[in-house]
């Protein structure tokens, strides 16, 4: 079977390629060029060292449109975007997956820490958490559709990160000791400096909950719900961003406790397996990647408006971010907080 491994030049995709080759797959490395400043040279060099074929797909224009422009637009609207979710759905496992299949691959693999299985009863592919809770990336994959999951392999889903590093050492790979980047791939530093040339903004007012003006903000795109640092407001007590109103160009500030709520509404709901709907009564959900899962009741309000009622109040549910819900190790679905 021919498998195209999405190679970034990092440890995870490299070990994925080696594992699949050991398992007898015919492996080709596939790298997407999505930034002007890089062209996949590192991935090509590693593929050469592994003695596997390597191909490059230029996706700079669609990446700019689907991910970078979306990223800037969301901040302009007072939202906090989730570019990795967008990229996985539309670019990596959308256009790049299609390119791999067009090039003759039967399956596509990546170094994501997640798992996929097939349920005979429901005849559905199901997305599962990776076994390493610190590295699990299923949150970022919740929008994948059945036709995408049917073509994917995640070789690292059953391993912990340290096991992957140990395998890299065993393969004598120099990148075994490389530090992982925690940044968004197309933003080398502060996101505010990145978006500044690409968004419209003007100064406006910080208000408290009584409507009193507390100070001036630098522009809607530069703030997010729950933010405390960088407000430059003297109020004699800690204040946090409670609400962002781009239409009025105002930002509401208040105390930390006001950020907590048991009720969350979201839209653009996506089920991994449509048969799961009847099961969706009690779930565990997380409102951002780094959040702890919390028990909740899920139900539909109207059309594409969904509601989660949590047992424990959640802090700073942020419009634009993804809420993802689980049962056990299985990702049932998720949507966009509004």
Curated annotation (Swiss-Prot):
Residues that hold ATP according to the record: 6-13, 32, 111
GO CC entries: cytoplasm
EC number: 2.8.1.13
Region (Interaction with tRNA): 135-137, 288-289
Catalytic activity annotation: S-sulfanyl-L-cysteinyl-[protein] + uridine(34) in tRNA + AH2 + ATP = 2-thiouridine(34) in tRNA + L-cysteinyl-[protein] + A + AMP + diphosphate + H(+)
Enzyme class: transferase
Feature type site, description Interaction with tRNA: 112, 321
Keywords, sorted A to Z: ATP-binding, Cytoplasm, Disulfide bond, Nucleotide-binding, RNA-binding, Transferase, tRNA processing, tRNA-binding
InterPro entries (UniProt xref): MnmA-like, MnmA-like_C, MnmA-like_central, MnmA-like_central_sf, Rossmann-like_a/b/a_fold
Cell compartments where the protein resides: Cytoplasm
GO molecular function: ATP binding; tRNA binding; tRNA-uridine 2-sulfurtransferase activity
Listed GO biological process terms: tRNA wobble position uridine thiolation
Disulfide cysteine pairs (residue numbers): 87-185
Active site: residue positions: 87, 185
SUPFAM superfamilies reported in the protein's UniProt record: Adenine nucleotide alpha hydrolases-like
Coiled coil regions in record: none
Task performed by this protein: Catalyzes the 2-thiolation of uridine at the wobble position (U34) of tRNA, leading to the formation of s(2)U34.
Family statement drawn from the similarity comment of this UniProt entry: Belongs to the MnmA/TRMU family.
PANTHER family noted in UniProt: MITOCHONDRIAL TRNA-SPECIFIC 2-THIOURIDYLASE 1, TRNA 5-METHYLAMINOMETHYL-2-THIOURIDYLATE -METHYLTRANSFERASE
Protein name per its UniProtKB record: tRNA-specific 2-thiouridylase MnmA
Protein's gene: mnmA
């Amino acid at each position: 079977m021919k498998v195209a491994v999405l190679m970034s030049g990092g440890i995870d995709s490299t070990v994925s390629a080696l594992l699949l080759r050991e398992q007898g797959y015919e492996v080709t490395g596939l790298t997407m060029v999505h930034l002007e400043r890089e062209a996949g040279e590192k991935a090509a060099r590693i593929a050469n060292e592994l003695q596997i074929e390597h191909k490059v797909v230029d996706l700079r224009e669609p990446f700019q449109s689907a991910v970078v422009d979306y990223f800037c637009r969301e901040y302009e609207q007072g939202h906090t975007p989730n570019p990795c979710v967008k990229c996985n759905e539309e670019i990596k496992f959308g256009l790049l997956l299609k390119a791999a299949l067009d090039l003759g691959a039967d399956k596509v693999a990546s170094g994501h820490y997640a798992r996929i299985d097939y349920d005979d009863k429901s005849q559905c592919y199901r997305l599962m958490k990776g076994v390493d809770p610190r590295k699990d990336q299923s949150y970022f994959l919740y929008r994948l559709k059945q036709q995408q999951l049917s073509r994917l392999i995640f070789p690292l889903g059953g391993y912990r990160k340290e096991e992957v590093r140990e395998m890299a050492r065993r393969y004598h790979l120099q990148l075994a000791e490389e530090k992982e980047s925690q940044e968004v791939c197309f933003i080398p530093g502060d996101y505010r400096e990145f978006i500044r040339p690409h968004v419209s903004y003007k100064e406006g007012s910080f208000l408290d909950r009584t409507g009193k003006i507390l100070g001036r903000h630098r522009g809607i795109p530069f703030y997010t719900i729950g933010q405390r640092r960088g407000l430059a407001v003297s109020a004699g007590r800690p204040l946090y961003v409670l609400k962002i109103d781009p239409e009025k160009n105002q930002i509401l500030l208040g105390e930390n406790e006001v950020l907590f709520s048991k009720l969350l509404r979201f839209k653009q709901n996506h089920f991994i397996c449509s048969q799961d709907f009847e099961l969706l009564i009690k779930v565990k959900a997380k409102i951002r990647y780094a959040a702890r899962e919390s028990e909740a009741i899920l139900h539909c309000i109207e059309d594409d408006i969904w509601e989660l009622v949590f047992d424990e109040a959640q802090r700073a549910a942020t419009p634009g971010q993804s809420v993802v819900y689980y049962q056990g190790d299985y990702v049932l679905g998720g949507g966009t907080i509004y």
